[in-house]
């Protein structure tokens, strides 16, 4: 073991540790971090070398965070990354410091947002919050209005999770929706992601994603927001239904094909008869 450690550079150790961390299942970051910490056995190297992995994990997972003094939770995403460890809360028009290891927000400060997109962002945010409240009991959302390559763009992010470590499973839903304000019709692009980990007496993961392409009629901000939400609702319902139907098909066909219906003799075993034979034989030998 010592020879192996001598051959592996600190840079390579950090690279391996970062891979483990960024691939941690939802709700299991702390467990993976603690295991990696034991393996690496160098806290300074881990914190300094793998800090980017902590940030990448939280942004990839759309980690929700509560900011003291504000009611709504905001999602940690690449779209809200302001640099230097600060993130944007576009709903409350503030920025805040985020500790990627402790997953805590601090130092909220007023933050200017793009005024040209304020009405559009607010309309989409209001409509999306109502949708998430109806469809995701544990869901959160954050909507951004940004100029990307000179085009005014709305980006809507949704996150919902269920962490049940006592029942040996954790899961998370993520979806990201974008459209550019270009009348009369705007292209809508999205990616939907599901990740579930079940680990009682085994280790099974569901990792699924689907890309969406659609279009929305651009009129007023409020009406466009309504049409945008209709597209989101239809696509996400179809995706969840398809996942459920796929599992039912697998249960009815694939999983059944994995086990033999009859033994090699092609004859069913009468276990009751075998048991009576065994009892009779034991009585004879008594």
Curated annotation (Swiss-Prot):
Quote the subcellular location field of this record.
Cytoplasm, Myofibril, Sarcomere, Z line; Cytoplasm, Cytoskeleton
Entry's Gene3D superfamilies? F-actin capping protein, alpha subunit (3.30.1140.60), F-actin capping protein, beta subunit (3.90.1150.210)
- Quaternary organization: Component of the F-actin capping complex, composed of a heterodimer of an alpha and a beta subunit. Subunit of dynactin, a multiprotein complex part of a tripartite complex with dynein and a adapter, such as BICDL1, BICD2 or HOOK3. The dynactin complex is built around ACTR1A/ACTB filament and consists of an actin-related filament composed of a shoulder domain, a pointed end and a barbed end. Its length is defined by its flexible shoulder domain. The soulder is composed of 2 DCTN1 subunits, 4 DCTN2 and 2 DCTN3.
Q: Would you tell me the Gene Ontology cellular component terms? A: cortical cytoskeleton; cytosol; F-actin capping protein complex; plasma membrane; WASH complex; Z disc
Q: Does the keyword Cytoplasm apply?
A: yes
Report the protein name in the record.
Answer: F-actin-capping protein subunit alpha-1
Task: Give the source species.
Answer: Gallus gallus
Q: What the protein does?
A: F-actin-capping proteins bind in a Ca(2+)-independent manner to the fast growing ends of actin filaments (barbed end) thereby blocking the exchange of subunits at these ends. Unlike other capping proteins (such as gelsolin and severin), these proteins do not sever actin filaments. May play a role in the formation of epithelial cell junctions. Forms, with CAPZB, the barbed end of the fast growing ends of actin filaments in the dynactin complex and stabilizes dynactin structure.
């Amino acid at each position: 073991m010592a020879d192996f450690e001598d051959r592996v550079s600190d840079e390579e150790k950090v690279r391996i540790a970062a891979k483990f961390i960024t691939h941690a299942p939802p709700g299991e970051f702390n467990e993976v971090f603690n295991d990696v910490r034991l393996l690496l056995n160098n806290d300074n190297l881990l914190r300094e070398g793998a800090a980017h992995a902590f940030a990448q994990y939280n942004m990839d997972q759309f980690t929700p965070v509560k900011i003291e003094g504000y009611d709504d939770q905001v999602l940690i995403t690449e779209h809200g990354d302001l640099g230097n460890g600060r993130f944007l809360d576009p709903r409350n028009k503030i920025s805040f410091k985020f500790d990627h290891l402790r997953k805590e927000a601090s130092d909220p400060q007023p933050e200017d947002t793009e005024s040209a997109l304020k009405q559009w962002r607010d309309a989409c945010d209001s409509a999306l919050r109502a949708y998430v409240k109806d469809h995701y009991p544990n869901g959160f959302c954050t909507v951004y209005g940004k100029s990307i390559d000179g085009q005014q763009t709305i980006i809507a992010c949704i996150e919902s999770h269920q962490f049940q470590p006592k029942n040996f499973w954790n899961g998370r839903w993520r979806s990201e929706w974008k459209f550019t304000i270009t009348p009369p019709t705007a292209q809508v692009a999205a990616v939907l992601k599901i990740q579930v980990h079940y680990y009682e007496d085994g280790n099974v993961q569901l990792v699924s994603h689907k890309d969406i392409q659609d279009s929305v009629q651009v009129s007023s901000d409020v009406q466009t927001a309504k049409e945008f939400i209709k597209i989101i609702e239809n696509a996400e319902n179809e995706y969840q239904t398809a996942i459920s139907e796929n599992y039912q098909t697998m249960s009815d066909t694939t999983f059944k094909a994995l086990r033999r219906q009859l033994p090699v003799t092609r004859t069913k075993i009468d276990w009751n008869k075998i048991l009576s034979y065994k009892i009779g034989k034991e009585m004879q030998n008594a």
